[in-house]
Regions:
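Catalytic alpha/beta core domains of metabolic enzymes, predominantly
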Residues: 50, 67-157, 163-182
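Active-site beta->alpha loop and helix N-cap motifs at the rims of alpha/beta catalytic domains
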Residues: 1-62, 96-99
Length: 186
């Protein structure tokens, strides 16, 4: 049975280029076998820091859908976009939460990615907001132009609560929690 709105990314667990390609082909075959829209997750670089763009280019040329992960820089986006095939769908996972942890606004990275997608006419590239830290990242990802966001179930629950509580009520509940915690502490 088809799952038209569902895709799944499965990561290779190797650093050797030949083994990464072998695993990627195997993972890709599971999509047909199990009728899933499978993307093969490839890290942006090897353990020693060398880019995986030759692997990305080879797999994309074979029509294997990729999710290139652990992306943090403009240069990485440029290299990935140039390596991707215009006929093969791909996801570029930008670790927005971790960028913010070091004081960098991820909006600039996403804006650059959108510009690169337009410049190269590679419309099948989607950008993923990874490493969400708080529920409001859902809004951040939308305003940054992310096509996809990953969130934990706990964060999704909080997003589902958006606009369902007035700030004054939330303030009251927080103050009540302070007293309850103090009472429990003795």
């Amino acid at each position: 049975q088809a799952r038209p709105e569902t895709n799944i990314s499965l990561e290779v667990f190797a650093d050797d280029p030949t083994e990464m390609i072998r695993q990627a082909r195997l993972i890709d075959s599971w999509g047909d076998e199990f009728n899933y829209d499978v993307y093969v997750k490839i890290p942006v670089m090897h353990y020693d820091g060398t880019p995986t763009t030759p692997i990305i280019a080879a797999l994309a040329a074979e029509g294997i859908k990729l999710n290139v992960t652990a992306v943090f820089t403009f240069e990485q986006i440029d290299e990935i976009v140039d390596a991707l095939d215009e006929k093969t769908p791909a996801i570029i996972s930008i670790f927005a939460g971790r960028l913010r942890d070091i004081g960098i606004d991820a909006h600039y990275i996403f804006s650059h990615g959108a510009d690169e997608r337009t410049r190269t006419n590679k419309s099948l590239i989607k950008y993923l907001w990874a490493s969400s830290r708080e529920a409001y990242n859902f809004i951040d990802a939308q305003s940054a132009g992310a096509d996809i966001i990953t969130m934990t179930p706990d964060l999704i629950k909080k997003v589902n609560g958006f606009n369902k509580k007035e700030p004054k009520q939330f303030s009251l509940e927080t103050c009540q929690m302070f007293i309850d915690d103090a009472t429990k502490a003795g």
